Curated annotation (Swiss-Prot):
Origin species: Myxococcus xanthus (strain DK1622)
Organism placement in taxonomy: Bacteria, Pseudomonadati, Myxococcota, Myxococcia, Myxococcales
PANTHER family: ATP-DEPENDENT CLP PROTEASE ATP-BINDING SUBUNIT CLPX-LIKE, MITOCHONDRIAL-RELATED (PTHR48102), ATP-DEPENDENT PROTEASE ATPASE SUBUNIT HSLU (PTHR48102:SF3)
Protein name: ATP-dependent protease ATPase subunit HslU
Task performed by this protein: ATPase subunit of a proteasome-like degradation complex; this subunit has chaperone activity. The binding of ATP and its subsequent hydrolysis by HslU are essential for unfolding of protein substrates subsequently hydrolyzed by HslV. HslU recognizes the N-terminal part of its protein substrates and unfolds these before they are guided to HslV for hydrolysis.
The UniProt record lists the keyword Cytoplasm: yes
Length: 459
């Protein structure tokens, strides 16, 4: 669990997100409260539940990015879902419990990656040893191969032992890259059959059954495939296989489930789309289904147990962050019980022209830095003058005001239109400097500025 102070969290979020200080403070406090909870005595710890957050603001102002960056900062399992994709029980579609299963899968991947990184040096050494034996005439067999039913496993082929001096010589050549062009033949385990993947869907996860685990010991299901590859790829395949042997899957599963339960973050986007305009008091129509989804979400947010293929998962201490534009509906249109489960309400401000200028300049991964890095691969040294950046922000703001306000996402299509010509011709231009000024911006984007009807077709 991250021990960042709220001020440090806000400072870190400032590197990627412009403005929205109220939302940053809210998520920073929520993250710190998780750390504080871990320091509390055991008898009180289970009684402290996270305070869920609902973000209200137009699209493109940073709601999703704040939640995503927070999860990375906390090194916590994170999943983003859209409330409008869910249907209530009895209707065709995704059920709300799938968000918990997705979170556990994200936690499994996160913990497995951490454990694989820990055993990386040892796996590298073992992979090199196997590759050296292979190149000296030995065999490399996959440990997951299963003999046909009724037959004893074949005896292992004789392996020509390599002396320590020869082994170190080969190892030095491997690491120096002098053997990169050599081809070797290795056996690798095949992935699960296609028909098995077709049966491992949502229905089986609901009852906590993983068919691939059930059938993994059936004779003939685990097959290997012989491949002829170059040494670097062979080393990568063997490294992956050795790392899988060194990582304890049971430990990964236990740690992942615990981390999902205690540190998991679920971002529920478009929650305004399931808000009934009558506040749940209306009659039939689609509002019935909307309210049904809300009532299905309610026990998960309150705290319940969900069956997954990795076991039972409790949702009592997961942090839920909901977000919505609420252009048509309003937060009070959600059912009262669900409103009460999101006690922290934060309103995000629409982006101004000054905000768009800062978004182009300040973030660590700003769009201008991205385009500059992309074109530098072709030898084109792209640069933007200050007046060009200001003009870009002004045009984006004007387009947002005259058509739909999509916030910072407008900058993506504005820049694509601006740099269309240089992106197309960069490979033919050769190494050169290319400066974008305000005059060039107005020239390239004149049609968007002058024709308001045309701008309605531009995202």
């Amino acid at each position: 669990m991250s021990a960042f102070t709220p001020r440090e969290v806000v400072s870190e979020l400032d590197r990627y997100i412009v403005g929205q200080n109220a939302a940053k403070r809210a998520v920073a406090i929520a993250l710190r409260n998780r750390w504080r909870r871990q320091q509390v005595d055991d008898d009180l710890r289970d009684e402290i539940h996270p305070k869920n957050i609902i973000m209200i603001g137009p699209t493109g102002v940073g709601k999703t990015e704040i939640a995503r960056r927070l999860a990375k900062l906390a090194q916590a399992p994170f999943v983003k879902v859209e409330a409008s994709k869910f249907t209530e029980v009895g209707y065709v579609g995704r059920d709300v419990e799938s968000m918990i299963r997705d979170l556990v899968e994200a936690a499994i991947a996160l913990v497995r990656e951490e454990e694989t990184e820990k055993v990386g040096p040892r796996a590298e050494e073992l992979a090199e040893d196997r590759l050296i034996e292979l190149m000296q005439g030995g065999g490399v067999k996959s440990s997951s191969a299963t003999p046909p039913f009724g037959f004893a496993p074949p005896p292992p082929p004789p392996v020509q032992r390599v002396s320590d001096s020869a082994r170190e010589k080969f190892r030095a050549q491997l690491r120096a890259g002098t053997l990169d062009d050599v081809e070797v033949e290795v056996e690798t385990a095949e992935s699960s059959p296609t028909f098995m993947r077709g049966f491992s869907g949502q229905g089986m996860e609901e009852i906590g059954v993983n068919l691939q685990d059930l059938f993994k010991n059936v004779p003939g299901m685990n097959k290997t495939r012989r491949r002829r590859v170059r040494v670097p790829e062979a080393l990568q395949l063997l490294r992956k296989e050795e790392a899988a042997k060194l990582v304890d899957p049971d430990r990964v599963q236990r740690e992942a489930v615990a981390r999902a339960e205690m540190n998991g973050i679920i971002f529920i986007d478009e929650i305004d789309k399931i808000a009934s305009r009558e506040g749940g008091k209306g009659g039939g129509g689609p509002d019935v289904s909307r309210e049904g989804v809300q009532r299905d979400i309610l026990p998960i947010v309150e705290g319940s147990t969900i069956n997954t293929k990795y076991g039972v998962v409790k949702t009592d201490h997961m942090l839920f962050i909901a977000a919505g534009a609420f252009h048509v509906s309003k937060p009070s249109d959600l059912i009262p019980e669900l409103q009460g489960r999101f006690p922290i309400r934060v309103e995000l401000e629409p982006l101004t022209g000054e905000d768009l200028v800062r978004i182009l300049r300040e973030p660590k991964n700003s769009l201008l830095r991205q385009y500059t890095a992309l074109l530098s691969t072709e030898g084109v040294r792209l640069s933007f003058t200050d007046d060009a950046v200001t003009e870009l922000a002004r045009i984006a703001q004007q387009a947002n005001e005259s058509t739909a306000n999509i916030g910072a996402r407008r900058l993506h299509t504005i820049l694509e239109r601006l740099l269309d010509e240089v992106s197309f011709s960069a490979s033919e231009m050769g190494p050169r400097d290319f400066q974008v000024d305000a005059a060039y911006v107005r020239e390239r984007l004149a049609a968007i500025v002058q024709d308001e009807d045309l701008s309605r077709y531009i995202l």
